[in-house]
Structure formats: C-alpha cells, structure tokens
C-alpha cells in the first residue's frame, strides 16, 4: 500500500518550554497528520543528547531523552506545581532550541517531581524497572556518576569506576542510590508518556518511523559497562574510530570519532547485543531506520587520535550474518536501510538480500544528468522510501538558492516551475508521485522554509538540531 508522511523530530514541536515535548502539541501534530491523510511520522533518535546536542551521539542507546518529558502531565499527576516549571526561563526564541538553557533547568524541575513521586510511587514503576533491568541500572548509575563528576566523560573518572571494577560499582550503587532512583524515575515517566503517544498515533492509523545510529558515542554507558563489544585496548581507549573517507565534497573525509565494534566477539555471542538493540527499537517504534547501513557490509576505520579521516582503511563487517540472526530471533522486523553514501556492488547485494527498503533522496538527483539514480524516472523498485531531503540536507528552498545555475536550471525544467519559491512544493509533488511505496517530506520543505530552518550540517557543531516549529498556525493552510 502506498503511503506518505512527514519527517519532523520531537524537539521541533512547538510549546512554551524550550523544546518539543510528548504533550498536547505532539497529539495535535498527530491530529494534523491524520487530517492531512498522512500515514507516517518519522523522527530522529529519541536518546538523551550529549555535548553537541546531536541525537546521534548519545549517552545511551536505550534511554529516552529527559528533555521531551511533558511537564504539564507531571503537574496533572500532582508531581509539579505550575510555578515550578511555568515561571522558568526556557529560552527566548520559540523557533530555536537553547540546549544550554534547558540543561540548566530541566533536571532541577524533574528532581522536584521525583521528590513528590517518592512519597507515593506508582505500582507500575517497580515493574518498569524490572522489565528494563538489562540496561536501566547501569544507565542510572552512569548518569549519577556523570553528574557527581561534573559532567566529565567516564574515561576521566577515577580508575576503579572508569574500569568498571565490581567492588567500586557495588559501592557506587549504594552511595548514589537516591540518584539512581531519580534516573530510573525519569525513564519511567518518559516511556510511560511515549507509549501513550504512540498508541494514540497508531489508533489514528499513523506509524512512527524511528531511527537508530549504527555507532554509539565513546562517552556512553554501553562502552563504559560492556567494553567487550567494542574495539578498545586494555585501557578502554579506542583502537580505531569510525568515519568516512575523503570524497568530492570533503577533502579530509569525515572523522566521527565513535569506537568501532568488536565484530568477532559479537558474532561469537550470536549478535546478541545488536539483536537486543533492534528488538528494543522495534518495541519503541513501528518502523526502524538504521543509519549508515552500508557499515554492516564494510566499515571505514581511522586510527585513534588522527586529526582527519585521510589515513583510514576499509574492513569487512558482519554482512548478512547479522540480519539472518535478527530474522531468526525476531522475525520480520520493519527496517529501513539508510543506504546513502559510497555504495559498492557488495553493499547493494547485502541490501537486496536483506529485503529492506532503501532510500531515495530527490535533492541528490540533479547534480549530473538524467541517468542519476536519485531521479524518479530511474527508480527501479517500489521497495524504497522517497525523501525530498533528510535532516542532513539543506532545505529544498535553501538548496535551490545555493546551487549553481546549471543545476538550478535543470531542476526547474525537470519540475516544470519558473521560480525558486515554487521548487519545494514541486519537489514534494515529485516525491509523492514516485513509484516508491512510501514518500516522506521534511516539515521544513512542506512549509517552504530556507536554510535558516536546516536541522543539521554534517561535520559541524554549534548551530545544529535547533529548528522548531513556532506554532501550528501555518499548518492550517
């Protein structure tokens, strides 16, 4: 069945509290999607953001972002008083997230709620913690220690804690018991609210498309507590890190800095770490997009400490062995393979063997001639997701205004429009009319916004992940 949807992260929802929440605005957005006959809401990773604010560099692959917790719901439950969160400065620009300001105040507010919660815990709380024991205890301890160490990365902690020594861990669990309970409470409330929102969306016939990065952050609870799954030395330093080689767009390549996986160990363990991760994601979302899918066939390794990605090398990944195990243990999980970037015949073979739909990004279609594989008349399968652009792209209006005259002219001729301002909606129509089973447009392209609304510019920090929809007024049109 053909369907379409909108790409907009939770952080971009409007409200008065600095960043999008799982509250009434999220439900209103679901109502908008239903009214607009959309069937999908695609979001970015929902994990807690760390330094740089990227949802793709998180302290945990399992935890939800505390920033998204609906404070009004906590008030209704009796855990907050209005003045305790409404009289706080959350940022002075409704169109942009001030992550620094939110970090300053959100945990004080949530700790206030936790104090009241502890006086009369909900019965479902203990059940939630037990059901998530495989990750939540270590995550709660990790966050407790991080705050106790004034935000320092785990590899800068005292040696016994850094090395996850059993005696030190046991002592820390006792010392930080109250803090651990707080971080468990935060996750309990997050997932309680998330499940209600997802159920509401599903009732309206809308699927949530989630996103998981292929790699995890070095400063994460997973690398700290389960180093055996990663390519680390005896001091828990990465041997090599992830990235991409130089190409026509980046002379130095891309140095992501994430530790790489110890695929030999993971394979011996029947890929349990990855199977559990995909299982958790499939329980959280209806469909799971896996970022940098080609990295499972072969991945680029850069020596730890290198200043750029020039001296890296390719190594073979687990390929279909992983996804055969996923299918064996989990059945047919709905997965989207982010297959953008440097693709070889081996990557294409893996994608075809998996049966997962890949991605077609229209913005990539106009930089050569009419044989470009991202132009709809060259699409060879319906088993793909067509996008106007992704979170890493310029908005369509920003792109058409910045590209060279030859590309601009070719694009307008292809779309049959005469002005730059007409291109975004023409591109949306092109996306919708492709043969792909699913078509997704960025909200910024639906609203014909320029690059001031761009979500992310890869390999840069500072101005990313900030864009917000100021209100739903424009959607009424």
Residue spans for each PLM region:
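Catalytic domains of carbohydrate-active enzymes, especially glycoside hydrolases
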Residues: 24-49, 284-285, 431-433
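Surface-exposed amphipathic alpha-helices with a cationic face
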Residues: 34, 194-202, 327, 351-352
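Outer-envelope exported proteins of Gram-negative bacteria
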Residues: 44, 207-209, 213, 287, ...
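Conserved, well-ordered alpha-helix/loop/beta-strand core segments that scaffold catalytic motifs
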Residues: 183-216
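Glycan-recognition and catalytic regions of carbohydrate-active enzymes
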Residues: 448-451
């Amino acid at each position: 069945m053909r369907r379409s949807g909108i790409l907009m992260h939770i952080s971009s929802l409007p409200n008065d509290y600095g960043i999008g929440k799982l509250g009434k605005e999220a439900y209103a957005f679901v109502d908008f999607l239903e009214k607009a006959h959309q069937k999908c809401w695609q979001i970015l990773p929902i994990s807690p953001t760390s330094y740089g604010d990227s949802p793709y560099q998180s302290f945990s692959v399992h935890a939800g972002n505390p920033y998204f917790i609906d404070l009004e719901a906590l008030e209704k439950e009796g855990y907050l008083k209005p003045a305790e969160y409404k009289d706080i400065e959350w940022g002075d620009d409704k169109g942009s997230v001030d992550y620094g300001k939110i970090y300053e105040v959100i945990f004080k507010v949530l700790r206030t709620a936790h104090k009241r919660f502890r006086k009369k815990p909900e019965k479902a709380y203990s059940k939630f913690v037990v059901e998530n024991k495989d990750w939540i205890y270590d995550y709660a301890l990790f966050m407790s220690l991080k705050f106790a160490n004034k935000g320092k990365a785990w590899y800068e902690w005292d040696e016994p804690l850094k090395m996850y020594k059993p005696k030190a861990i046991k002592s820390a669990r006792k010392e930080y018991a109250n803090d651990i309970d707080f971080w468990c409470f935060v996750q309990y409330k997050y997932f309680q609210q998330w499940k209600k929102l997802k159920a509401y969306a599903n009732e309206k016939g809308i699927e949530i498309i989630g996103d998981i990065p292929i790699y995890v952050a070095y400063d994460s609870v997973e690398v700290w507590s389960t180093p055996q799954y990663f390519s680390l030395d005896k001091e828990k330093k990465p041997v090599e890190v992830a990235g991409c080689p130089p190409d026509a767009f980046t002379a130095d390549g891309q140095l992501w800095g994430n530790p790489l996986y110890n695929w030999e160990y993971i394979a011996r363990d029947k890929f349990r770490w990855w199977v559990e991760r995909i299982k958790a994601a499939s329980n959280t979302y209806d469909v799971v997009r896996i970022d940098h899918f080609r990295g499972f066939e072969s991945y680029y390794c850069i020596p730890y400490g290198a200043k750029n990605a020039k001296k890296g090398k390719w190594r073979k990944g687990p390929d279909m062995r992983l996804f055969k195990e996923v299918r064996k243990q989990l059945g047919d999980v709905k997965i989207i393979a982010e297959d953008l970037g440097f693709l070889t015949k081996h990557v294409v073979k893996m994608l075809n063997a998996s049966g997962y739909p890949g991605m077609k990004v229209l913005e990539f279609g106009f930089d050569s001639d009419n044989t470009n594989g991202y132009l709809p008349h060259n699409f060879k399968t319906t088993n793909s997701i067509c996008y106007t652009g992704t979170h890493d792209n310029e908005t369509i209006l920003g792109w058409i205004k910045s590209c060279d005259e030859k590309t601009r002219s070719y694009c307008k001729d292809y779309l049959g429009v005469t002005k730059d301002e007409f291109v975004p909606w023409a591109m949306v129509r092109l996306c919708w009319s492709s043969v792909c089973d699913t078509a997704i447009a960025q909200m910024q392209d639906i609203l014909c916004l320029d690059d001031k609304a761009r979500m992310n510019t890869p390999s840069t920090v500072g101005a990313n992940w900030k864009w917000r929809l100021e209100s739903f007024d424009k959607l009424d049109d």
